[in-house]
Amino acid sequence: MSVSFLIFLPVLGLPWGVLSQVQLQQSGPGLVKPSQTLSLTCAISGDSVSSNSAAWNWIRQSPSRGLEWLGRTYYRSKWYNDYAVSVKSRITINPDTSKNQFSLQLNSVTPEDTAVYYCAR
């Protein structure tokens, strides 16, 4: 028997701040099977992924766990990553300067990973 569960991904650009006009556009699959890898991308407009003043985050929200910060990547003369302890062994967040975007990879997903996933600055 094959079991699947949904990964909800809002399709919208989120402006952050009245003056900044920064928009983030998420993309990725809506359905991932248990034990597979979830891969999501967040394209940035109005700012640079390698900005020295920004951090680029992935968060998720589910009825059972509420709002949960997963991790971030940021540039301060070199690249840094911070990850939530709950997913640290399964998560990778990578910047892509050539496409001005950053990505989330979550390995070995389970039904408990079912959530709405957001990227945020």
From Swiss-Prot:
Residues 56-72 are annotated as: Framework-2. Residues 1-20 form the signal peptide. The lineage of its organism: Eukaryota, Metazoa, Chordata, Craniata, Vertebrata. Residues 21-121 form the Ig-like domain. This is Immunoglobulin heavy variable 6-1. Residues 120-121 are annotated as: Complementarity-determining-3. Disulfide bonds join C42-C119. SMART domains: IGv (SM00406). PROSITE patterns: IG_LIKE. It comes from Homo sapiens (Human).
